């Protein structure tokens, strides 16, 4: 039987300089292959890692778009449909680790975690994604993460769509055989911030939720301290680095770690409590404790509420981030934090669920491979780019504000003019509605002694008939009183009679 390979559609879109999106549509029952070249390694002796993940076939609805998380942080990224975000999970397929040697890479470790039927991933000189006898269960998004040392991760995406077949059930994932180990439910709960006055005694309470375990185990709690630094705007905790502290991107210098909590290795450990023979049954955990000399006389664990602790006579230098890590059989399994500070030293704390270098900020970097000096200067250059974007945004916002003020002023003047004109028209209208003189008496009326009240309304015609003598041209002025509350209107009339 001959296998017919056909690649129907392959389009590549450059995304923010650090990612490629390949879109493949394959008819059901056919096969397709796409090759994704590797990024050239840079420094000999460094690690080069690749990880393939898969988001299942709920994610056929995809697109690329311009995303702005903040006014100055915008980038082009992959946009997924609502069904993808609601029903699908990103499944890790395999991870390969290489070492860079003379400009090439040599594989030193490979681990297949899950498998998708009819999908083959090649790990040779250049990666290949092969689809044989495609069915709808193969559809989805395949993502390759590539990283050389501690440099910015590269992202390659292959969106696979399968045409002309009814929906199959989701594939049965094949998992490798691994040694089983007992596990327990372990979590820590506490308040995340506490503000104190200098000289206070404070209690930091942490509740431990421990599920049942069939075996005797080792339980250890470590209290790590990241001191407050006035140059920090906020503090960031990189959660993956708590569970994998030896990852290259988690290990940083002391100067770089003043504002973020990454590897446990870089952070001062001020206290620890360890129990070798712990059980969730009738036996109670008995801990051996150790306190760092910097807080020896002031910090003590609260028993039996370990890892809760009490600190006496707290000072300004005690302000900062305290992270409690729980290790089950020597393996980090849970963690929590509390930020202790005075009012003046309070900072916000943000939890980041990626290792340093991942996430949307990595897309802001230039896509080209940089040398050592350029890599060390990335932080300052990205800050300059953000500042430039902020300046443009501020100028635009100021211009819009000035324009809005001008529009309000001009509109107010126009409204005032219209109101004034309307009042004049209303005044003239009221004057026209009230009785007025048909003709005005002159000084040569002779014996006529008609009161002014009789010249209005019903007596107007009568008065006009009685008048026979022609009046000479003269000027006269009279005041018309409309009402007590109405405005006074003076009208000059030139009479021609």
Swiss-Prot record:
Quaternary structure, from the entry: Interacts with gI.
Intravirion face residues: 420-497
Gene Ontology annotations for the cellular component aspect, listed alphabetically: host cell endosome membrane; host cell Golgi membrane; host cell junction; membrane; viral envelope; virion membrane
Annotated transmembrane regions: 399-419
Cellular compartments annotated: Virion membrane; Host cell membrane; Host cell junction; Host Golgi apparatus membrane
Primary localization class, coarse: virion
Keyword Transmembrane helix applies: yes
PTM: Phosphorylated within the acidic cluster. Phosphorylation determines whether endocytosed viral gE traffics to the trans-Golgi network or recycles to the cell membrane.
Pfam families linked: Herpes_gE, Herpes_gE_N
Stated role: In epithelial cells, the heterodimer gE/gI is required for the cell-to-cell spread of the virus, by sorting nascent virions to cell junctions. Once the virus reaches the cell junctions, virus particles can spread to adjacent cells extremely rapidly through interactions with cellular receptors that accumulate at these junctions. Implicated in basolateral spread in polarized cells. In neuronal cells, gE/gI is essential for the anterograde spread of the infection throughout the host nervous system.
The name this protein goes by in its record: Envelope glycoprotein E
Entries under SUPFAM superfamilies matching the protein: Immunoglobulin
Organism listed in the record: Gallid herpesvirus 2 (strain Chicken/Md5/ATCC VR-987) (GaHV-2)
InterPro entries registered for this protein in UniProt: Herpes_gE_N, Herpes_glycopE_Fc, Ig-like_dom_sf, Ig-like_fold
Gene assigned in the entry: MDV096
Glycan-carrying positions: 60, 133, 148, 203, 277, 366, 388
Membrane topology: Single-pass type I membrane protein; Single-pass membrane protein
Similarity-based family: Belongs to the alphaherpesvirinae glycoprotein E family.
Keywords, comma-separated and alphabetical: Glycoprotein, Host cell junction, Host cell membrane, Host endosome, Host Golgi apparatus, Host membrane, Membrane, Transmembrane, Transmembrane helix, Viral envelope protein, Virion
Residue ranges that the Swiss-Prot or TrEMBL entry lists as coiled coil: none
Ranges facing Virion surface side: 1-398
């Amino acid at each position: 039987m001959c296998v017919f390979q056909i690649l129907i559609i392959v389009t590549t879109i450059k995304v923010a300089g650090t990612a490629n999106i390949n879109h493949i549509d394959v008819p059901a029952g056919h096969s397709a292959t796409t090759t994704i070249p590797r990024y050239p390694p840079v420094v000999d002796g460094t690690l080069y890692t690749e990880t393939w993940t898969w988001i299942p076939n709920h994610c056929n609805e995809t697109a690329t778009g311009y995303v702005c998380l903040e006014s100055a942080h915008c980038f082009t990224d992959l946009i997924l449909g609502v069904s993808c975000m609601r029903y699908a999970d990103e499944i890790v397929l395999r991870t390969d680790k290489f070492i860079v040697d003379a400009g090439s890479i040599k594989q030193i470790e490979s681990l297949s975690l899950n498998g998708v039927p009819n999908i083959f991933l090649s790990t040779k000189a250049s990666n290949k994604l092969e689809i044989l006898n495609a069915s709808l269960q193969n559809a989805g998004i395949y993502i390759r993460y590539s990283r050389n040392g501690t440099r910015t991760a590269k992202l390659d995406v292959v969106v696979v769509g399968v045409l002309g077949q009814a929906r199959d059930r989701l594939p049965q994932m094949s998992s490798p055989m691994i040694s089983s180990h007992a596990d327990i439910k372990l979590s820590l709960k506490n308040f995340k911030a506490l503000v104190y006055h200098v000289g206070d005694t404070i209690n930091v309470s942490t509740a431990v939720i421990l599920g049942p375990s069939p075996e005797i185990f080792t339980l250890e709690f470590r209290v790590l301290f990241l001191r407050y630094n006035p140059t920090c705007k906020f503090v960031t905790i990189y959660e993956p680095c708590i569970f994998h502290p030896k990852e290259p991107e988690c290990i940083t210098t002391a100067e770089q770690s003043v504002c973020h909590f990454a590897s446990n290795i870089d952070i001062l450990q001020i206290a620890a409590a360890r129990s070798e023979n712990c059980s969730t049954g009738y036996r109670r955990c008995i801990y051996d404790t150790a306190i760092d000399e910097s807080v020896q006389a002031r910090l003590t664990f609260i028993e039996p509420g370990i890892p809760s602790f009490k600190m006496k006579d707290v000072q300004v230098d005690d302000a900062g981030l305290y992270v409690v890590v729980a290790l089950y059989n020597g393996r980090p399994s849970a963690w929590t934090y509390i930020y202790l500070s005075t009012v003046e030293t309070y900072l916000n704390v943000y939890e980041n669920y990626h290792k340093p270098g991942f996430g949307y900020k990595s897309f802001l970097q230039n896509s080209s491979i940089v040398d050592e000096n350029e890599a060390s200067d990335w932080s300052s250059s990205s800050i300059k780019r953000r500042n430039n974007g902020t300046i443009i945004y501020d100028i635009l916002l100021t211009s819009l504000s000035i324009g809005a003020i001008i529009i309000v002023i001009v509109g107010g003047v126009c409204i005032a003019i219209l109101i004034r004109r309307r009042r004049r028209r209303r005044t003239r209208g009221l004057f026209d509605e009230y009785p007025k003189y048909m003709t005005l008496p002159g000084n040569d009326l002779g014996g006529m002694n008609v009161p002014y009240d009789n010249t209005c309304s019903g007596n107007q015609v009568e008065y006009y008939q009685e008048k026979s003598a022609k009046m000479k041209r003269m000027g006269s002025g009279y005041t018309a009183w409309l009402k007590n509350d109405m405005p006074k209107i003076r009208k000059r009339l030139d009479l021609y009679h």
